[in-house]
Amino acid sequence: MILKNNFMRTVLLFIGFALINSVTLSSCGGGSDDPPPPNEANLAVTTDPANETVQPPALGPYNLKVTITSAMPPNGVKIEVSAKKDDGSNTVFFSTSVNRTTAVSDFSITGTPAATQCLVETKVTSLTKPTNVWSGSYRYSSK
């Protein structure tokens, strides 16, 4: 009789332990329910004036057209444009940053110093996938 009671007690303790563990472990979860990052084509961009070119000296206006030629990311893009003297001084005289959902964006670079070669840098970043970035530059001179 004592042996039977010890056996039953052991079985009941085992079942209780198993139930507690199953409830505890099932609430641990398997990780985050965050969706995977969106699958997005690399940004492809053209500029006018073209990337990596040197424009002849001109009086202005100094316009820049940025065209997204790849599929537009679902949340759009951030376009950053800056212009500075091309003398190593890093003094920026024009800077803008805009968010866009359209493929074509026009900019007018202002504040260009006279008789100076300038460097325009353009950076386009996906607002959906911030690691998806395109960068380019061109040079122009004012008369």
Each language-model region and where it sits:
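Post-signal-peptide N-terminal segment of Sec-exported extracytoplasmic proteins
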Residues: 44-89, 119, 125-137
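Local beta-strand/beta-hairpin segments that build beta-sheet-rich folds
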Residues: 91-95
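Aromatic sugar-binding surface patches on proteins
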Residues: 99-107
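Surface-exposed, short loops/turns at beta-strand junctions within beta-sandwich domains
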Residues: 109-117
